[in-house]
């Protein structure tokens, strides 16, 4: 990425699985403001510190906030994990300025890993990983589970699609591993068969 991590590409695909929501959002907000194009996948597996019951109570309090005279004017309450992440990042960006709006427009977030991103290399952000930032034994909950509790209706669908994608990826991985094994055997056999010719060429200093 641009700011300090040493990676800079036209588009970075971030696997959000087991990343802390706030830390991930703050890092991505800075990257977006630096001009980096970011795609976030598997938003339903983002972690939030605190148990599910406490997080659900906090979100239900947020859902009660509305404009009395015209509730459709806001605040808008998103239920999907990708939109919750998008709104969190929006709060860390001056999105009402041209620079902030342009930065926010370069962010894309998805539940699961839709094509073509299932065939692209995905990266993680160590500074936002749960295993490095959350104390052992501390309670946490998944954003997808929270979204399901507050009205997101696609949790089961995304889970089923992810299981199918993982099974397909495993078959593809086993096939590639088998082909690599056959290729290495073919190289060893060719080296044995060509050993006399190679010795002759070496003696001629070719």
Swiss-Prot record:
<dbReference type="InterPro" id="IPR005755">
    <property type="entry name" value="Ribosomal_uL13_euk/arc"/>
</dbReference>
<protein>
    <recommendedName>
        <fullName>Large ribosomal subunit protein uL13</fullName>
    </recommendedName>
</protein>
<dbReference type="InterPro" id="IPR036899">
    <property type="entry name" value="Ribosomal_uL13_sf"/>
</dbReference>
<dbReference type="Pfam" id="PF00572">
    <property type="entry name" value="Ribosomal_L13"/>
</dbReference>
<dbReference type="GO" id="GO:0017148">
    <property type="term" value="P:negative regulation of translation"/>
</dbReference>
<dbReference type="GO" id="GO:0022625">
    <property type="term" value="C:cytosolic large ribosomal subunit"/>
</dbReference>
<dbReference type="GO" id="GO:0003735">
    <property type="term" value="F:structural constituent of ribosome"/>
</dbReference>
<comment type="similarity">
    <text>Belongs to the universal ribosomal protein uL13 family.</text>
</comment>
<keyword id="KW-0687">Ribonucleoprotein</keyword>
<dbReference type="GO" id="GO:0006412">
    <property type="term" value="P:translation"/>
</dbReference>
<dbReference type="InterPro" id="IPR023563">
    <property type="entry name" value="Ribosomal_uL13_CS"/>
</dbReference>
<keyword id="KW-0689">Ribosomal protein</keyword>
<dbReference type="InterPro" id="IPR005822">
    <property type="entry name" value="Ribosomal_uL13"/>
</dbReference>
<dbReference type="GO" id="GO:0003729">
    <property type="term" value="F:mRNA binding"/>
</dbReference>
């Amino acid at each position: 990425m641009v700011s300090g991590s040493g990676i800079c590409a036209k588009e970075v695909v971030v696997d959000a699985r087991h990343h802390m929501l706030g830390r991930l959002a703050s890092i991505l907000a800075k990257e977006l403001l630096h001009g980096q194009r970011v795609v976030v996948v598997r938003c339903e597996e983002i972690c939030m510190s605190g148990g599910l019951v406490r997080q659900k109570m906090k979100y239900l309090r947020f859902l009660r906030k509305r404009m009395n005279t015209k509730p459709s004017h806001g605040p808008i309450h998103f239920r999907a994990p990708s939109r919750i992440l998008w709104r969190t990042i929006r709060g860390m960006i001056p999105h009402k300025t041209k620079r902030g709006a342009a930065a926010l427009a370069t962010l894309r977030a998805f539940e699961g890993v839709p094509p073509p991103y299932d065939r692209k290399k995905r990266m993680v952000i160590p500074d936002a990983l749960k295993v490095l930032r959350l104390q052992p034994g501390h309670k946490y909950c998944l954003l997808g589970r929270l979204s399901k509790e507050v009205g997101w209706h696609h949790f089961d669908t995304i889970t089923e699609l992810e299981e199918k994608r993982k099974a397909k990826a495993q078959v593809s991985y086993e096939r590639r591993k088998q082909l690599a094994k056959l290729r290495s055997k073919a190289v060893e056999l060719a080296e044995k068969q060509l050993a006399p010719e190679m010795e002759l060429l070496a003696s001629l200093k070719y």
